[in-house]
Amino acid sequence: MQDKIVIHGARAHNLKNIDVEIPRDKLVVVTGLSGSGKSSLAFDTLYAEGQRRYVESLSAYARQFLGNMEKPDVDSIDGLSPAISIDQKTTSKNPRSTVGTVTEINDYLRLLYARVGTPYCVNGHGAITASSVEQIVDQVLELPERQRLQILAPVIRKKKGQHKTVFDKIQKDGYVRVRVDGEIYDVTEVPDLSKSKQHDIEVVVDRIVIKEGVRSRLFDSVEAALRIAEGYVVIDTMDGKELLFSEHYACPVCGFTVPELEPRLFSFNAPFGSCPDCDGLGVKLEVDLDLVVPDSSMTLREGALVPWNPISSNYYPQMLEQAMTSFGIDMDKPFEELSEEEKQLIFFGSDGREFHFHYENEFGGVRDIDIPFEGVVTNINRRYHETNSDYTRTQMRTYMNELSCVACHGYRLSPQALSVRVGGEAGLHIGEISDLSIADHLLQLDKLSLTDNEATIARPILKEIHDRLTFLNNVGLNYLTLSRSAGTLSGGESQRIRLATQIGSNLSGVLYILDEPSIGLHQRDNDRLIASLKKMRDLGNTLIVVEHDEDTMREADWLIDVGPGAGVFGGEIVAAGTPAQVAKNKKSITGQYLSGKREIPVPLERRVGNGRFIEITGAAENNLQNITARFPLGKFIAVTGVSGSGKSTLVNSILKKTLAQRLNRNSDKPGKFKTISGVDYIDRLIDIDQSPIGRTPRSNPATYTGVFDDIRDLFAQTNEAKIRGYKKGRFSFNVKGGRCEACSGDGIIKIEMHFLPDVYVPCEVCHGRRYNSETLEVHYKEKNISQILDMTVNDAVDFFKHIPKINRKLQTIKDVGLGYVTLGQPATTLSGGEAQRMKLASELHKRSTGKSLYILDEPTTGLHTEDISRLLKVLDRFVDDGNTVLVIEHNLDVIKTADHIIDLGPEGGVGGGTIIATGTPEEVAANEASYTGHYLKGKLK
């Protein structure tokens, strides 16, 4: 086999016909500026071709189900292995996907509980066991010889009634005696039973003495008793002791039954085991009373019931006032002072009691009717489930929240599944063990109390679970729980989960391609991640990692720097070699940062802010330990801490959602906290994340930033446009008029191919220019509208230098380092980092109030150190204008430039959730308890 992968003539996206050699069975890091072509080389060339060759090897019949992959634009690739991509874009948003299902640990847990689990009565009557006739007989024969026994069939247990038909059937079946409520009677002489009392009725099947040769008779009698009592038998030893047996998993005291233990019983994705109330989701969509009455100090007349406020109709306000008058409820009393009975009536209705409703609409229509009062909660639920209107359903949804299912307490499983425990009655059920952190889960497995027989059965299952948990622990995910919904994971977390799964597969000879696995990982955990990558390499695999993390680059066997710039200024191999060789390459920007010739400087002084702050007290959502956090305003704030320490919970779930409620009227419910102060010092909340700026190719930088509106205005003002009567809309490719109708303004036509990938070809009518020929005849400075869209931002800045309104917006795009992007580049082709910087550019050209709060969650994702340097300059501009910038970040180059740090920890999960250190980077670095401070020391020298 070849010792290297050889690529000739790669031209995907901005790659400039490059040739590159990649050593096999090595840890190879591909780096470079955002937009330089790293992903084009790793994913769109290497992975795409590896996948395509595999799919091509299958039959045409199989290919129609798998889909066909487009051949990447490359001349040849030699030495290619089967490729597996582990990126951040394939996180499951299915609410049924959890960490346990994605890693397949749940499959082994289900098997463990099915094989060595013991069900326990939910009513506290102890273990529930199932016994065969043979097992019952063997156990009875262990009693002392000459022991006298009664074999009873319990046909009625704790049921009210006279039960005459039961006695008739017993007599008809040929049995002579019965035991009723502990007393033996002849079946024909049973006294009349009280209808209102509970009774126990047992058929006396046989009376025997334990002695040699009795086994056959005992077997027949036990079998008969089980048949009569539908699986139950009582062995009365005649000296006050009774033995209860069942051939089913059923409690002999209360009758609680459990089906035969099998893996599907413990699956919340199967009807057999899922909670019947929430269908295995663990949550139910319920009306949230806090959203219905957000301010309980208001009266009903003042509008305490938000859903029934008179926005478009007076129907509900009129009905409310007349109903309250009828039922004697004061409309002018603060809602919080109403009695519980009054609140229940307002929320859930009058329980059939009617009131007279006289309604007059704005058109003069009158309605007189006696009706029960429905209640606002009942009304919202009914309208949400019965309406055919998307608008109404959306409106009703704003007053609802996903609340933990009351029936299963959020565990997703049926009572029968949750009754099964491993390790005795003190052990945990499968829901409880799934709620443990990975680290605690490992400890729990190590101290399981099993019998010798159970240990033998469980050993291979426990090994698989233990190995997978250890892999998760080793990639820095020790704080996660198996019950954590996959949709709530960050891109970095989901990628490391799949990485752990691949390590567990022990494959060799595979080409793994990873996209920034260090995202969201604290420096403390980076060493463990790198060790995991090296372990995969040592199994005989080739790892190609797109990465900007300095530690990962230094630990690589081979480093490829793509550049020198981004977009049209990138797409070349600037340097390739060992990290030491790249560090010596003067052309490589990456090399200059590795060698220390370039660096992001530590600020000479820290900002003092404006003296005001936002303070949150009693923050207790997820793992937060009832903390108080102060965010000083007018500063650059970094919230830091190990993965899972509570950073996102504090900033995103509590601070951001609370401010969004107060400032933007958002209905998302914040996490748990007691009070928040200082909100009045903020007038705008701007969340700048890395989500796409548009979900269709029609969205582009020009449309997103609003500069395209100005450009279309400019074209509409040209003499040619005025002569032809063209308005601004003529120059839009989204509406009929000026666009090419052959391609609907897309510029390309999709041709569907049978058994081959769809082919996209330039439109034959407009030749990819999006507009019809008449529109393209209008020029501004010898350029038509299509040629403007093909310009890079750098070129457009010069072209429109005398049009301040346009130039200012374009300059902000250039300032954030996106000068290489074309104005018409489809938004779907922008990376997450590029999309985030485009949002920053859009904010930059808006007029600043000096009272804005910008929140960025890990803004360095996908960014090279050079990109981070530019990003920091932009963020500094926001703060210098008097605004506040708050980032959640692990990157030490960003943290060291902050004015104020809030460090959470000390660990992740239940071991975190407290504030370890606050202050300037220098103050945090001096704090011995802070992991962040420990790593920060080296950056502040």
Regions picked out by a protein language model, each given a short descriptive name:
Residues 1-941:
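Conserved phosphate-binding elements of NTP-dependent enzyme cores
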